[in-house]
Amino acid sequence: MRFGFSTAGESHGPAEVVIVHGVPAGLRLLAEDVDRDLARRQLGYGRGGRQKIERDRVEFLGGVRHGRTLGSPVAMLVRNRDYANWERRMNPAPVEDPPEPITLPRPGHADLAGMQKYGFGDLRNVLERSSARETVARVAAGAVARRLLGEFGVRVFSAVYRIGEVAMDRALAAAGAGKADRSEVRCPDPEVSERMKAEIDAARHARDALGGEFVVVAEGCPPGLGSYADWRDRLDARLAAAVVSINAIKGVEIGDAFEAARRRSSEVQDEIVRRGGALGRASNRLGGLEGGMTNGEPVVVAAAMKPISTIARALRTVDLSTGEEARAFRERADSCAVPAAAVIGEAMVAVVLAEAFLEKFGADALEDIRASYEHYMRRIGLPARRADA
């Protein structure tokens, strides 16, 4: 089975659940590997009150024994501590005194289209699953992918380079992505970080919210992940789809795509050069991807996130129970979630790269995958990377 995952759970239900399939046997995997990324997702200047309640910790339900994967699906659970405050409203069992339905859909959310699609009379049935709380499960799956990629020296980082009108050079942000965890807004430039925080404070004071842009960088990918032979296997398309599936992400860019559209071809292509005894590139304007495949340079994927749709200053809507104009229902939300989205972006990029890696080198046992990888790297004249390389 191909590497991938499925999630289940509602925002204020008992737990978020994820099943990761296609995980090879023999991979070292500990709860702390997952908890580290779960904690990073919860950080970030501008987060809402929910993060003061939750203390996300993973529980393995299957697929791992004594710290090693078994080759069977890895099942994980992250409990929602806030469920204790929502048990009557979100109990899976019938209740004698159900809560009043919510009929004031919020612009920018899945509320109205979701109610129309599924025939619901209560938008709670939509917003609970469409909530970004589901990304807890994605980050857990991404942590498994990160551990697998790490065995072969592939590392995935992210950095925020824009929040609202405050921005830094994206190339500099990508180069400093390994240091982004030091910043409350995941921006590697300390001076820009402070201006971003001030921008978030101003939006919060105005009872509003901010979006922004982040970049994910994957270093150490061997050439040849993905394929040009079938459109479904093209890696840039798969990466773009995975990243834009994150809540509130409205645009994705591979390398310098939009800048390249304004330049001549001779100014855009990454020329092939010798690096010692191996082949490399003189630049990385195409973001490490050519013809739907990795080319050995760092994979660079940027994303644009719109502002969180739920704001204190409720927007106009129509009450579906009366047909009258009204103000939208307000659910607790963040002022800015771009730093958290960057961590989720890492997870989605890691999942896609892990899937492509196992397609190329096999998927049953880690030992066999390593042998296949090392043989391939010898054949193309590049050194094989190891864990922590």
From Swiss-Prot:
Reactions this protein catalyses: 5-O-(1-carboxyvinyl)-3-phosphoshikimate = chorismate + phosphate
GO biological process assignments: amino acid biosynthetic process; aromatic amino acid family biosynthetic process; chorismate biosynthetic process
Pathway, per record: Metabolic intermediate biosynthesis; chorismate biosynthesis; chorismate from D-erythrose 4-phosphate and phosphoenolpyruvate: step 7/7
Cofactor(s) the protein needs: FMNH2
CDD domains, A to Z: Chorismate_synthase
Recorded GO MF terms: chorismate synthase activity; FMN binding
Annotated positions binding NADP(+): R41, R47
SUPFAM superfamilies: Chorismate synthase, AroC (SSF103263)
NCBIfam families on file: aroC, PRK05382.1
Protein name: Chorismate synthase
Gene source species: Rubrobacter xylanophilus (strain DSM 9941 / JCM 11954 / NBRC 16129 / PRD-1)
